[in-house]
Regions:
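Acidic-residue sensor for enzyme active/binding pockets
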Residues: 113, 169, 218
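Cytoplasmic/organellar membrane-interface segments at the starts of transmembrane helices
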Residues: 87-89, 142-213
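Residue-level detector of conserved catalytic or cofactor/ligand-binding positions
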Residues: 214-224
Length: 224
């Protein structure tokens, strides 16, 4: 929970796009940890799904930073602004990835966080509410980033000269966008790949918990 809240607040203060995305990655891994330690089916499934989803989304966002860095050699947010007016294809894909990162329904970023929170609410209302606040912070820094970079005011004259994404960049980014949207709308194939393993893990945990309780209670009964 501390990792989620703290790194989300740090991300809000970043002026460097790459650092902002890096801190957001730490926050998202906080949800993975939270889901695992709920020891619930929903929480653990959400953690696994979140790891896979975040791998796609973070890779896409880092690639997006690399694309504009290759053109203007700057990762600073204030270097950019109004990119939608000059490189619309890039801007459209960046928007998809940013919305996925904040957990918009219909993207792979939604289901993982939803399942983790569902598992957390079963165990601790306070922890779940704090994690939900982290989701709000995540939406804040991703929307803040998108507003300034994609829809902000263009103060740098060099932006007007840059080229939109080339064919190889289109292939990479569109492929990532496809899987992010596909697993957002149709998560079942991915969920089925680890459903058996999660059920087995939960079963083993519950068995171990029962056995430990039996061992604890036996000395008490013998002493009586």
């Amino acid at each position: 929970i501390i990792a989620i809240i703290y790194t989300s607040l740090v991300a809000l203060m970043q002026d460097d796009m790459k650092k902002l995305i890096a801190y957001s990655s730490v926050a998202h891994m906080g949800y993975v940890t939270l889901g695992i330690f709920t020891f619930t089916k929903q929480g653990i499934e959400g953690s696994v799904y979140q790891m896979i989803s975040h791998g796609l989304i973070s890779a896409a966002l880092f690639l997006c930073v690399g694309v504009v860095y290759d053109r203007l050699h700057s990762r600073m947010i204030n270097t950019y602004g109004g990119l939608v007016n000059y490189i619309p294809k890039y801007s459209f894909l960046f928007l998809i990835f940013a919305l996925a990162a904040l957990g918009l329904p219909g993207t792979s970023g939604f289901l993982g966080e939803f399942l983790v929170l569902a598992g957390a609410f079963q165990k601790s209302f306070l922890a779940a509410m704090l994690a939900t606040f982290g989701v709000v912070l995540g939406a804040a820094y991703m929307l803040w980033l998108t507003k300034r970079v994609i829809f902000g005011v263009t103060n740098n004259s060099e932006i007007k000269k840059i080229n939109d994404i080339n064919k190889s960049e289109v292939v990479m980014l569109v492929t990532l966008a496809f899987f992010i949207l596909f697993f957002g709308f149709y998560p079942l194939p991915l969920m089925e790949t680890f459903n058996v393993s999660v059920n087995s893990l939960i079963s083993n945990y519950e068995t171990a918990l029962i056995l430990s309780l039996i061992h604890i209670s036996e000395p008490t009964r013998l002493s009586v």
